Amino acid sequence: MSYEDRDTYGMYKNYDEKGPGPRLMGADTLIGDDVYNQNDEDLGDIKDIMLDVNNGRIAYAVLSFGGFLGMADKLFAVPWSALTLDTVNKRFLLKVDKARLESAPGFDKDSWPNMADPTWQNTIHTYYGTTSYEDTKSSKDYVTPAHRNDESFIPQAPVGTDHVKREWD
């Protein structure tokens, strides 16, 4: 099932057509989306989306793979940056062979890892060949503590960046 099939509010019918799909999407419409690889192999579907609430970013999509009728599925936290939205086929693409996904670090539904643990994050990003968004230079480096209590101050992201970090976080 695709995000358009779950669009009960009609959010996506008139998106701006400037990108590969809607610019903003409801997280609940992504749950259940299929994930395929470049060989058109079914890798499973998205079971959950993990948000980094401190940074306002999507950190991981939790992918379910390998079970039968939802039983004995293995779960995998895939870095959001490793996924690409395929708007033609209404699914996500992950550039990983099925055999490699089968041997990826995973977990079961009753034993989730601590996804905030930097060692765990490094393992996952290394496995999928991605860089954590926390490791990329951003406007987060340009806000000083002097602005901490100034409610009128609205930090601006420098050109080429997408978010603002407060130094006191």
Tell where the protein language model's regions lie, with residue ranges.
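Peripheral interaction segments used for macromolecular assembly
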Residues: 1-169
